[in-house]
């Protein structure tokens, strides 16, 4: 699917979820994401420009293996909605994609300005002030997530903490050992 196809399909999403309906502009794919695609775009609606993000995709095959504790994109969106309703900072979910949209599983949120690359946050002096308060803020936000009403997000109950991660670690170690066996190191 090319950018024009995606923009055309986003037009229908915007028409359903922005009042008044708008037109997508400046569509560009962002870097990052191992199994999901993230796009930035602007939507002009009612004389205002809305800066938005669409994230879609996700490998349901990974969920079936139980190796990686991962949520479906729709579940991510529903978790962001539940979190923001109790005051946890989260992007505002503007739309959850539907099959008729032809964009796969995903959602559209407001764009949140900021830096996402950990290396820049750790090394760039302009983030020194943020680094001074970040651990405290992250702890407060993480603690606040415990106030989410679990019946609102029942899909979280299927994740058993640690079990999928341990399986993944064992698989990773086995793969590393297998590679080491195939590539003997010099004495």
Annotate each predicted stretch with a short phrase.
Residues 1-21:
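Juxta-kinase regulatory segment immediately upstream of eukaryotic protein kinase catalytic domains
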Residues 7, 11, 169-177:
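An amphipathic alpha-helix signature
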Residues 12, 16, 78-81, 187:
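A conserved long alpha-helix in the C-terminal portion of kinase-like catalytic domains
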Residues 21-28:
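Conserved N-terminal boundary motif of the eukaryotic protein kinase catalytic domain
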Residues 22, 184-185:
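Residue-level signal for secondary-structure boundary elements
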Residues 28-170, 178-184:
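ATP-binding pocket architecture of kinase catalytic cores
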């Amino acid at each position: 699917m090319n950018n024009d196809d995606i923009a055309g399909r986003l037009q229908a999403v915007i028409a359903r979820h922005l009042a008044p309906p708008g037109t997508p502009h400046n569509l560009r794919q962002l870097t990052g994401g191992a199994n999901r695609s993230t796009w930035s775009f602007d939507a002009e609606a009612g004389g205002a420009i809305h800066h938005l993000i669409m994230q879609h995709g996700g490998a349901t095959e990974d969920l079936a293996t139980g190796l990686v504790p991962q949520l479906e994109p729709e579940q991510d969106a529903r978790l962001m909605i539940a979190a923001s309703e109790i005051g946890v900072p989260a992007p505002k979910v503007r739309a959850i994609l539907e099959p008729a949209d032809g964009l796969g599983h995903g959602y559209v949120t407001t764009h949140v300005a900021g830096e996402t690359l950990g290396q820049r946050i750790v090394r760039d002096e302009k983030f020194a002030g943020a680094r001074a308060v970040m651990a405290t803020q992250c702890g407060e936000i993480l603690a606040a997530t415990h106030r989410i009403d679990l019946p609102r997000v029942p899909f979280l109950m299927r994740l058993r903490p640690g079990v999928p991660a341990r399986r993944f670690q064992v698989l990773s170690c086995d793969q590393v050992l297998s590679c080491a066996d195939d590539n003997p190191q010099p004495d």
